[in-house]
């Protein structure tokens, strides 16, 4: 009997639901809708033209998703995609370092690396986060069974490397440790890594953040990344439940916007933006930077002028006001502890008093106990994913914002507001020097040049995880054959191929691996 998670890939739908419908759905149903939309293609679509930029900012339109231009999410294979072979070349272990979303992209890369090498992937290890001191691990954050089941057409996955039983003796396989180069090309995995795997039966790649090149000239490999990121990586039920509780309460009062307010100590120290703080606070930031980042000459005025400083809370408020959002706008803040305290939040709160975070929306003990660390970040991620509008205030090296931008694009071109900090910097600097005439009009001109969530070409340095168009999207009536949606029976095709290589006796075998290795 097939599992529920597998059936979610089969459900029929009449197309992308209206905004009102989405507002009434629970997170579980919405996730189901996301999966269904990307693998089935029975909806009506509009024109194949990409949407043009608006001539003015219409706040009411921003509460709706951007025009799709006839594109829809699709990470299903479109060419010959054989299932994992019965025998693989060995086991692949990886240690994913960084925060929740840096680890998330590393997991996507690990699955792809396993596919490239025809390896059995050992459930990825999540590094105990150095900032949150969180050691929840993969099993504590993600739905393991769903992860394995969803990727059964792509790679074999086990919980740990099994022991070898031979001649009545048990032998443990020790993985050979390798430090992969940053942004390693596919060739490195097919030569250096694969050679070591065949020699030692298992390899351990550590650290594994940004260890596989993002730009790969193979659309099927890129679509596998999307299958991992947007389908296989599902948070555990209790995290989804906490997120659902918050979203339901926010939606009960209408539209809401989420903002990733990146004004925390680690980001400010990384950016080298110290001068707006008092001497004691600057001392704290300099100490943190010295302990955690490479030594570099950083001058605040120069950094700010080129858009390298995170927006302050007040600047965020001024941008929204210039765009003509009013003070009744409900805003959910996804942020850790803001550095500098209330003195920086007060101007923002004056402009937009309806500010919330996960603790203020749902002050339950259960949520309070998990509000910090990776679980708290996971809850923030889900709320931001499902919000009507998402605004990152610093989407440079911020993996949280980058992943969310890509996920919301895949989710149906949901509206995002991405301030161009470099273009806005001289406007804010002039305002601070007393030049306030024409300030809001100048901000609006900058914001009109940004993309609010529709399909757009990925241009370096934009990350694949921020924008997976066009590889992970398709059209029913495309101009190019490579953009054509796969057939409706793609799952049945993959199923039949998988069944053809299965060992009929595998279901009776047991070992120390995660149940589901041979599903």
From Swiss-Prot:
This is O-fucosyltransferase 1. CDD domains: O-FucT_plant (cd11299). It is found in: Golgi apparatus membrane. It is a single-pass type II membrane protein. One of its GO terms (biological process) is fucose metabolic process. Pathway: Glycan metabolism. Residues 46-519 are lumenal. Glycans are attached at residues 118, 327, 357, 511. Its EC number is 2.4.1.-. The gene is OFUT1. GO terms for molecular function: glycosyltransferase activity. Residues 1-24 are cytoplasmic. Keywords: Carbohydrate metabolism, Fucose metabolism, Glycoprotein, Glycosyltransferase, Golgi apparatus, Membrane, Signal-anchor, Transferase, Transmembrane, Transmembrane helix. Residues 67-86, 497-519 are annotated as: Disordered. One of its GO terms (cellular component) is Golgi apparatus. The chain crosses the membrane at residues 25-45. Residues 506-519 have a biased composition (Polar residues). Pfam families: O-FucT. The keyword RNA-binding does not apply. Substrate binds at residues 260-262. Belongs to the glycosyltransferase GT106 family.
